[in-house]
Design a protein with these regions (language model features):
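Conserved catalytic core of two-metal-ion nucleotidyltransferases
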Residues: 3-72, 92-101, 107-187, 192-219
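A short secondary-structure junction signal
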Residues: 73-79
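Short, His- and charge-rich active-site/binding loops that engage polyanionic ligands
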Residues: 83
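Non-catalytic, alpha-helical, charged scaffold/linker segments
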Residues: 88-89
């Protein structure tokens, strides 16, 4: 959702959501290392390997990505991309993932500087960089929270005013020009993937739909 709506939802989430749904951001859960929000079901457990060691809400979730406009000027774009790289490396100190040689070196340096203890402060700076920069904005809309880089940058007309569609029995709003949006991001998205490419990128240590993550944390 656009940043303005995202901020409005963040303010209203506690009164809009049932008590067992937790709106997780770096503000509501300071150790959560995400530049976007998650609606977590606190009655359940989904502990991903990369963040298993973090003391935060680990309920089953859906991601909520804020959409921001890209700067118009090339220099501002370059500056923003540099800031993003720096902040991502600083936040990465809390993740349990395999890294290349350079990544291990940067991680060691950032941990020496104590960034593993400053997740919320780093994310606040990161959010300000992508959402509150000065200067003119272009008509390019960015999802900075997802992992596919500039494939997440789309012309505003892709989103348009939105389009109502049915997803697993639910009426949801999708991009107005969803075909153009999906084609830019995935190519021939209507064709089935080869079997060897049908692999997820989320790996968990515990998944339990009937027991709260808080119970596992006590063990």
């Amino acid at each position: 959702m656009y940043r303005e709506d995202y901020r409005r939802f963040s303010e209203k989430a506690p009164e809009l959501l049932p008590e067992y749904y937790f709106w997780q951001t770096y503000r509501t859960d300071p150790k959560a290392p995400f530049i976007f929000g998650k609606v977590r079901d606190s009655r359940t457990t989904y502990i991903e390997k990369s963040v298993a060691g973090i003391d935060m809400n680990h309920g089953v979730y859906i991601d909520v990505f804020p959409l921001d406009f890209y700067p118009e000027k090339r220099f501002s774009q370059w500056k923003l991309e540099l800031q993003k790289k720096i902040y991502k490396h600083q936040i990465a100190t809390v993740y349990q993932v395999k890294r290349c040689f350079l990544g291990r070196g940067l991680n060691t340096l950032n941990r020496f500087l104590g960034y593993q203890h400053r997740t919320a402060k780093t994310l606040a700076k990161y959010e300000k960089a992508i959402a509150d920069y000065s200067g003119k904005r272009s008509d390019i809309v960015c999802n900075h929270g997802n992992w596919q880089g500039k494939l997440e940058y789309s012309p505003q007309w892709h989103y348009g005013e939105g389009h109502w569609a049915t997803f697993e029995g639910l009426k949801v709003r999708v991009p107005e020009n969803y075909d153009a949006y999906l084609t830019q991001k995935y190519g021939d998205w209507r064709s089935d993937l080869p079997e060897e490419e049908k692999q997820g990128h989320h790996f968990y240590t515990i998944c339990d739909l009937h027991r709260s993550y808080a119970d596992y944390r006590k063990q």
